[in-house]
């Protein structure tokens, strides 16, 4: 009798352990995604795409990390599998990390905003503090390019992750000069008319945000990642075709519920500007786009060597986005 009770207890324990193990495996199989930087309205596209992909079987866990540096550290220590919102050029070339970008998400679209009472031109910023998003970010690259173009030298180039955070710092007066993305610039100008000035800046064609993962992970999880890339490209194209689409999807999917009313009211205007200026490329990246990145990031020092000598295949796996383009073309 005791033996039977023992077997029953053992079987129950084993069954529970099997269920627990299966549950842990299911959790472990989630694609762990790291979003570099605070969630701002320009990241609404990937949030909608993640919801679309989830409905199609893409199981993921999203972590919003404070900065590019923290996100890359989590990536290097295998705490996350996929990074959204920055690039891996320095990681691949200098640290020899086996990683590939697989879709271009956003192009550089930042404007230099200064406190008008302190500065009227780039020359006024010589010897002054300037604030950018993060080390190796597009904003840091642009700041150093403006130093060279205007023959000035900033006292310090300091890091404050997140354009909305820098926008609020401008409004509080704790900083006086920075790069902001378009929605944050619009927010600052509306909040304090006449107090801030946008300085002239040259146009650049390079990735501000891409999506990347380690090559072994891409090879093992191509099916899941293809679902995500398909969704990203679909949402980008629908948003560019009609900015009202992304606003309606935000409301339907209940995304960014705590977005301030003034920012929510400005969504359509932002995405119209984004569509007109090509901030979200309809193609998701190709060899020509990567070569533009090489030119920009070698000029900045993030990549070394001559742009013409760098190989696309060393930094990018374009097969996923190429497949997504074919699928979208076939459904027209």
Over which residues does each language-model region extend?
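Sec/Tat signal peptide C-region and signal peptidase I cleavage site
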Residues: 21-28
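Predominant activation on well-ordered alpha-helical scaffold segments within soluble catalytic domains
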Residues: 28, 47, 144, 186-189, ...
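Amphipathic, soluble alpha/beta structural segments
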Residues: 86-95, 104-111, 262-266, 317-332
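Pocket-lining segment of extracytoplasmic ligand-binding domains
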Residues: 87-88, 165-258
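Secondary-structure end/capping motifs
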Residues: 221-305
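Conserved C-terminal helix/tail region of periplasmic/extracytoplasmic solute-binding proteins
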Residues: 291-332
């Amino acid at each position: 009798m005791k033996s039977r009770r023992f077997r029953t207890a053992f079987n129950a324990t084993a069954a529970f352990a099997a269920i627990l193990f299966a549950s842990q495996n299911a959790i472990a199989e989630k694609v762990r995604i790291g979003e570099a930087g605070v969630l701002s309205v320009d990241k609404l596209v990937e949030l909608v795409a993640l919801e679309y992909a989830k409905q199609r079987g893409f199981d993921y866990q999203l972590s919003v990390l404070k900065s590019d540096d923290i996100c890359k550290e989590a990536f290097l220590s295998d705490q996350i599998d996929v990074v959204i919102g920055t690039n891996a050029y320095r990681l691949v070339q200098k640290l020899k990390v086996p990683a590939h970008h697989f879709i271009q998400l956003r192009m550089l679209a930042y404007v230099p905003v200064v406190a008008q009472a302190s500065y009227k031109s780039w020359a006024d910023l010589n010897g002054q503090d300037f604030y950018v998003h993060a080390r190796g970010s597009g904003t840091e690259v642009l700041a150093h390019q403006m130093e060279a173009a205007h023959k000035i030298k900033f006292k310090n180039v300091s890091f404050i992750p997140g354009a909305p955070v820098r926008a609020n710092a401008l409004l509080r007066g704790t900083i006086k000069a920075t790069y902001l993305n378009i929605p944050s610039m619009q927010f600052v100008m509306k909040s304090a008319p006449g107090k801030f000035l946008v300085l002239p800046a040259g146009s650049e064609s390079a990735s501000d945000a891409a999506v990347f993962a380690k090559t072994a992970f891409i090879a093992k999880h191509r099916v899941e990642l293809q679902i995500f890339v398909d969704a990203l490209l679909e949402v980008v194209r629908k948003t560019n075709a009609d900015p009202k689409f992304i606003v309606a999807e935000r409301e339907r999917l209940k995304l960014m519920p705590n977005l301030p009313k003034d920012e929510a009211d400005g969504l359509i205007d932002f995405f119209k500007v984004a569509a007109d200026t090509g901030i979200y490329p309809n193609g998701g990246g190709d060899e020509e786009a990567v070569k533009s990145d090489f030119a920009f990031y070698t000029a900045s020092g993030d990549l070394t060597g001559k742009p013409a000598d760098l190989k696309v295949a060393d930094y990018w796996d374009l097969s996923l986005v190429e497949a997504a383009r074919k699928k979208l073309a076939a459904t027209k």
